[in-house]
Amino acid sequence: MSYDDHAVLEAILRCAGGDERFLLNTVEEWGAAEITAALVDELLFRCEIPQVGGEAFIGLDVLHGADRISHVLQVTDGKPVTSAEPAGQELGGRTWSSRSATLLRELFGPPSGRTAGGFGVSFLPDLRGPRTMEGAALAARATNVVLHATTNETPPLDRLALRYESDKWGGVHWFTGHYDRHLRAVRDQAVRILEIGIGGYDDLLPSGASLKMWKRYFPRGLVFGVDIFDSRRATSRVSRRSAARQDDPEFMRRVAEEHGPFDVIIDDGSHINAHMRTSFSVMFPHLRNGGFYVIEDTFTSYWPGYGGPSGARCPSGTTALEMVKGLIDSVHYEERPDGAATADYIARNLVGLHAYQTTSSSSRRAINKEGGIPHTVPREPFWNDN
């Protein structure tokens, strides 16, 4: 099944927080097998690397009405959990069963504690003898790896960065604390994330590390990525667009029209100052109200090779940091004498920004029209210093 257009996942996310009838109708519309394939794909992605001391094959039965859709999951110590062919496999002592609606809600619904009776476990007959106790313990550990992946517990962002080998933490950059501070409030919402810059360059296999990180951090999110290098491969809830420059306004507008509006836009692209400025001016209007626009690596404003000044101490007027400085004036446009006449879209829709040392700056979109400070407040000091 292809997830390039996110149609199945978008349908799942729409119904996961709805009533039971809407959810079941969605499963019927798409087909239980199609929905189950997407759920199993997500389940495998969320499984932690097992530390189980061996290998076990766990059966998974997803029930929908009279239908029973069976999968086998291979849980091997130190390796990612994968799907396995049922034929010829000895299940590791148990089969786990869940209703399609229950599994869908646990993976993609709003946060909630697991209730009793959410799943069933059946033991195989060959576990009744004393010789199989070690196998039973292995099966229990393997089953726990899979069951834990359905909970609402998400690892901290720094751990996710290390797991998926993103450079946002632990090496050159230390961004995850800043991201978590601003984004944790929407972590469990059905958000849409766009990241400019996928990574991997001409070696496509390791690309998309931060996209996977965001996919795991936002369990109900859809993640999109664009890059100048061809990275078209997609996985569930992650879509990648192929070679295009971020300073191509028409291309970026097409991305926004096709996949937006976005809750978060992250510019981790070329880091060339002109590109960052172009992307911001084009893409900021495609943030939803309350969304965040993040520009990483603004320290290139000091590097001539990226469009920074040559031989000067401060960034020139054409750098990303100078643009950020100008945004402070934009936030306060209502206090300027010419504010109402000169305010552009960004000024009228930017309510705040944060800047961090050599790392990133984030801007929040919302309606910026509080009326300004009343004219009854004097514009000169009311005390006399003379």
Swiss-Prot record:
It is an enzyme of class 2 (transferase). S-adenosyl-L-methionine binds at residues 166, 195-201, 210, 227, 245-246, 268. Its EC number is 2.1.1.239. Mg(2+) binds at residues 268, 296-297. The gene is oleY. The active site is at 271 (proton acceptor). Its cofactor is Mg(2+). Coiled coil: none annotated. Residues 364-386 are annotated as: Disordered. Optimum pH is 7.2-7.6. It comes from Streptomyces antibioticus. 3-O-methyltransferase involved in the synthesis of L-oleandrose, a sugar attached to oleandomycin, a macrolide antibiotic. Acts on monoglycosylated macrolactones and mediates the conversion of L-olivosyl-erythronolide B into its 3-O-methylated derivative, L-oleandrosyl-erythronolide B. Also able to methylate other monoglycosylated derivatives, such as L-rhamnosyl- and L-mycarosyl-erythronolide B. This is L-olivosyl-oleandolide 3-O-methyltransferase. Homodimer. It catalyses: L-olivosyl-oleandolide + S-adenosyl-L-methionine = L-oleandrosyl-oleandolide + S-adenosyl-L-homocysteine + H(+).
